[in-house]
Structure formats: C-alpha cells, structure tokens
Amino acid sequence: MGLMYKKQLNLEMKLANKQEYRKEKDSMGEFDVPVDAYYGANTMRAKLNFPISNLRFSRSFIKSIGYIKMAAAKTNMELGLLDKDLGNAIVTASQEVSDGKFDEQFVVDIFQTGSGTSTNMNANEVISNRAIEILGGVIGSRVPVHPNDHVNIGQSSNDVIPTSIHIAALDSINSQLIPSLEKLLIAFNAKSEEFMPIIKTGRTHLQDATPIRLGQEFLGYAGQIERSINRIKVAQNELAEVALGGTAVGTGVNTHPEFAINVCHELSSILGFDIKETSNHFQAQSSLDNIVQASGCLKTLAVSLMKISNNIRWMGSGPRGGFGEITLPEVQPGSSIMPAKVNPVIPESVCQVAAQVIGNDATVNIAGQSGNFEINVMMPVAAYNLLESIDILSTSCSNLSIQCVEGIEATDAGPTMVRKGLAIVTTLVPHIGYDESARIAHKAQESGRNIMDVALEETDLSETELIEILNPESMTEPGSSGVAIG
C-alpha cells in the first residue's frame, strides 16, 4: 500500500508540474527525478516520504554542511584518498553550496529521518552532480563523481549532521547574535549613565518601594545582557568540539585516523574560529547535550528580554493613565479605532520572540532526550529550533536597541511620585523604629498628606533633620540616611 501510494503521488506530481524527469538509480533501484534537479534519487525519495511542512534547513546550516564537504574533500586529497581532479571539482561545488547558489535544491522537510541522513544525502547528491557538471559529465549518472564514494568519504550522517549544527550555531552566534547583544549592552549602559541623576519610586510586588535611580534600573538591564553574553560564550566553547570522525557509532570505522583532525583544522581556517575534534566521540554522537546547553543559554536570554521589555512597557505606560516615567520612540500608529494612540510595539515584538525561543528550547530539550544508544533521532528538529532562536534573538535585540532603547527619554513623573510616595518612611526606621514608622505611613495614607508633614507632627525630629533623613538621593546608596542615630 505504501509503495502504491508513493508511485501514485509521484505520478500526480509529474502531471501537476508537467515537468520532465530523468531516470536515476540509487541503492534501492531506479527512481524519477526532475531533469533539471541537482539532487538525486535518494533526495527525491525523501522529498516524497516527508510531505509534512514547508520548513527546511536554514541558510546557515546549508552553508555549514557545504564547508564540511569542502574541508573533507581537501583533506581526502591530502591523505591520498581522493583523486585530485574529482576532489577539486567537489571543492568548487561545495563552495558554491556554501555561497547559497543551490539553496533551492535542498528540498527535504525538517520533519524527516531523525539522523538527518536525507539532508546529508541531499548535500552529497547536489555536490556530486555539480562536480560532474564541472567535469563535463552527465548529471544523474553518478560518474565520475559518486555522492557516497567520493563526496562522503570518511563521513556518516551521524557525525556530519551534528557537526553541521554546531558550526552553523557558532557561525551565527559569532556573526549575528554577539554583535547584536553588544549593541544592546552599549545602549543600556548609555541610558544608565544618562538617567543616573533621575530618582523614581521602586516597585517591588508592583507596590511602592524605596527610591531607586532610573539609571540603576537600566544598569540592571545592562547586567542581564552582559551575563547572557558570558553564558553564550561558554556554550560556544562547547559547540566548538565536534563529532566529525566518529562515523556511524563513534568508533571511526571507515575513516582515516588523521581525517577528523585535518578536517577540523581546515574548517578553522575557513571559518576564522576554532573547530576541534571531540575528545569523546561516543558522547558527541549519542547525545545533543552541547546543543541543549546552548539552547538553554538562549532561553535564559529570552527570559531576561521578556522581563526587561515588560518593565519598559510598564514604565512607558500612559500617557495619562499609566506610570509615564519614560517615553518610547513613536514608530507607528497603535490603533485602528482610537486616534493618536501609540503602542510600545518594539518591546511587544521582543516579548513574542522571547516566547518563541522559550518554546524552541522546550523542543530542543525533548529532542535531546530522544537518543537511543549511539545516535540521537531528533537532530533535524533540534537544529531548526536552535538556529531559529539564534536568528530571531539576533534581529530582535538589534531592533530593540535601535528602534527603542536608544530613543527612550525620561519624564518628570518618576521624581514627582517619589515626593508623594510613602516608602521613603523606610529611612525613619533607624531613628524612630519600625512600628512608629509604619504608624506614620498609615496616617499619611489615610489623611492624603506626605510623610514629611506627618513626621513633623508625630516625632521629635526637626524639619532640618527630616529633610536630611528623607532625602531620596541618599536612599539610592547603601547605609542609613540622614543624622546620627541615638
């Protein structure tokens, strides 16, 4: 029934597309492949087997697998395992794959075989056929360049796919995420310095608390971003160790003893950052622990961004019914029915990205558990979610800094609320005790008066002493405010 279904589906696709097809052979026999396709029978089978979604491996992943095939071909030529003419054609074809010239030829769905074998073969076939074309041969003939015997020498999908994930993640983190986070860190630090003179009411449990400088709040945001950068850099060190060289189950069967170390050296040269062979192939191929760790660091960043963005939204709420302590850049109209309404759309966008990344991490965690014995069987979905998280965090952090944080301005609402607030009574505690201070705060709240006026009536402290004790500036630093206690 399954075979009949596939044949029928293949026929329907032909009729619908009105394409011309070529006959191509693989280890299972003949199969029809579009005449202009660079992929082959193995890929075509996978394309028909997995009509699940429109999700494909990302540009960063295809770039990485192309680099691996190129480095492998160079290494195999050096080791005398690959003819120079064939090898040079494979190198050229692999470079073209990395450059994005054949992205449309990577047609296998993300929801495929759990090892990613279909995508490894997709790469092997595209590179093989392009190399055949370069050498003047017939695409689909598998001569003089064979996808397995030449492009895949010394490799297995079981070590190529996890290595591709690591390299794609590292490359994207280096080129996109870290620069984006550093830009956001600079923006928060700049606002921290700008806003340090401005004192506002603290809000623990969303209730009035002792004063804090607006700059101190932004310094906290900067600290969260800085620590996320540090965590991600630790994860980068783990990702730099790759599975290549373990082949099928980690033993390295059918690979040259010097293959992996030489390929890693070549990859380091191509990429501009260090790639090293794992010290333990059995853990590297049987688990996705390093990928799970990296995703966890991205999730932590997402949690930080959600909290920071919500704080910015709250502080900018209003303009008349909210806190209104800051104003955000007005980037677009906010309502189709309420004129002049402007919403905090950039922080809202970041919150949605954070939610997506947190969900992606849950998927990666489940994928990481799904290894039986010597291989993980959810590598494609782990790759998709990890790389998507890196991509959307990179763009959203850059967007947050440029379109929001850099343009934030402070209002006078914060200092005004401090003067009216009750929490400044806290600095009376060292002088008159907790219970008496609480009584003064309750009386101020009930009477609608401020702490200063009530304290003048209810304590023996002079106005001069109270001005010094209740000075909000002194409350934003360690120590007791005001006059000597006793």
Describe these PLM feature segments.
Residues 2-486:
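Conserved, well-structured ligand/cofactor-binding cores
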